[in-house]
């Protein structure tokens, strides 16, 4: 379980190793806010040990795009870090012990894994039952699948689902400064808690943990708009409500054969 103390420790390691600290991390620390990436990274820090065989599905060029140092620590800590991705981006990932270019359905390794992670991958999956069946095949009995993805009914996701695909990169480039080769078609078939429970449950997984992660990053490139997001988040949290923009983080343990 990730604690506030653990998050703060990793926050300092992530943002305060190089001085001066940027205005955005300082602002988030002032508000006591940790973004979804921070929480995902801290969660994996609690799950990865020296005997962990880890498969990162859809890994691309980065295990943690915003935290290479932490990704390197976990890559050195685990026994195996294997990456799987049909994109050529996987060739640029320097931390993988093993890399496989292809789809999860066609992946036939000689081992099973203690942990399989899907970081911002679930929203692109067009065949959820097929993917879940492959995850059950790849995961050891008692092993975990960690799914970190966007929420289907968040404002940005709704707009994205209505917009033509060519517009996705234009918006992502403007707001998050991403590269075109990191933009892929979206499906949003595994992007609610109910859908994840149903799909993963049918494949023999039980939900071990689940969190809605408030996401105040839509306008984080600009100080004023980021401040407005954080103020709004603080007000909503004070009355027990989530911020409208959220991500999903679910951990699913393989407990039985698929139904």
Give residue spans per PLM region.
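Amphipathic alpha-helical segments that form well-ordered structural scaffolds
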Residues: 43, 47, 73, 195-203
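Conserved SAM-binding loop
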Residues: 45-158, 248-256
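S-adenosyl-L-methionine-dependent methyltransferase catalytic module, highlighting the catalytic core
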Residues: 5-10, 14-17, 126-140, 144-258
